[in-house]
């Protein structure tokens, strides 16, 4: 290889390395908050009859971004790929009924803003009343969901092993169709989503009284991204203080779901 050709290649190589280093150190310099969410997770995030993204968390995120002086980009994601979306920088946060419990060390979190529980939904005429009645039954849960993670945990080994099979689904709309058709006997899922899906069909489906696990929702950021987390946390606290959080909660749930504690202003 002649010297000139070698030098040219070396310069290009060094330029690429410098560019990559620059990219890795580059802070987010645009003014957009890109929110990753599952668009099939009502009432937290979903597509309405007009084809628009809506939901409790969507409305909260929009209000938060507006107060922070940022444009918001709502980015639907495959829930099973959420970590890749976050680590690649495709999204800034996951804000969509995102369970903190068991994931505390994987993300940088806001304070928990809402309590939640994972439950089983069955057909009303199935005869299934308790967890014990699920023995020999087909149970489904969304891939990489908190419900699936709970059932795969040591605490629920005996229960899981009693199932005929623990299946996974990509979205809960599909799960309810499978339940209605008899392809599965129970769905493990978030109680808020279950209640939304069951609206107008309470005679067809029931939620078992005993929950799988109690948990909390938070907004999750890439581990170490405390700067953006702190901005969002402070804005959420403002929304609690001025009553906006309560107003949005009551619109979607009929009551105030907020669990963020703020000091009373003197």
Where do the language-model regions lie?
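Extended ligand-binding regions for polar small-molecule ligands
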Residues: 58-67, 128, 132-133, 137-138, ...
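Short, low-complexity disordered leader/linker segments with a strong preference
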Residues: 1-32, 258-266
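A ligand-binding cleft/hinge motif common to bilobed small-molecule-binding domains
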Residues: 97-106, 152-153, 178-214
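Acidic, polar ligand-binding/catalytic clefts
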Residues: 62, 66, 71-133
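Ligand-binding cleft/hinge of the Venus flytrap
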Residues: 47, 61-69, 147-168, 198-202
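Periplasmic-binding protein-like
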Residues: 39, 115-122, 191, 195, ...
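Short glycine-rich His-centered loop
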Residues: 32-55
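Short helix-initiation/N-cap motifs at beta->coil->alpha
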Residues: 58, 73-84, 165-181, 215
């Amino acid at each position: 290889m002649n010297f000139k050709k070698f030098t040219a290649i070396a310069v290009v190589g060094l330029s690429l390395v410098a560019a990559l280093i620059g990219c890795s150190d580059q802070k987010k310099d645009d003014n957009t908050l890109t929110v990753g969410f599952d668009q099939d997770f009502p009432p937290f995030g979903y597509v309405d009859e007009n084809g628009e993204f809506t939901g409790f968390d969507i409305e909260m995120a929009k209000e938060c971004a507006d107060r922070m002086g940022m444009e918001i980009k709502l980015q639907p994601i495959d829930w099973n790929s959420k970590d890749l979306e976050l680590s690649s920088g495709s999204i800034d946060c996951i804000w969509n009924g995102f369970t903190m419990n068991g994931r505390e060390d994987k993300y940088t979190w806001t304070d928990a803003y809402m309590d939640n529980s994972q439950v089983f939904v069955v057909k009303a005429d199935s005869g299934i009343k308790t967890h014990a009645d699920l023995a020999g039954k087909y149970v489904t849960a969304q891939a990489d969901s908190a419900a699936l993670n709970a059932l795969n945990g040591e605490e629920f080994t005996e229960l899981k092993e009693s199932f005929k099979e623990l299946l996974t689904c990509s979205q809960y709309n599909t799960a309810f169709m499978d339940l209605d058709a008899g392809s599965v006997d129970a769905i493990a899922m978030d109680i808020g989503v279950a209640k939304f899906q069951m609206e107008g069909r309470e005679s067809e489906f029931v939620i078992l009284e005993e929950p799988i696990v109690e948990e909390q929702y938070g907004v999750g950021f890439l581990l170490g991204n405390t700067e953006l987390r702190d901005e969002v946390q402070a804005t959420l606290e403002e929304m609690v203080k001025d009553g906006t959080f309560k107003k949005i909660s009551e619109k979607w749930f009929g009551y105030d779901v907020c669990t963020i504690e703020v000091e009373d202003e003197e």
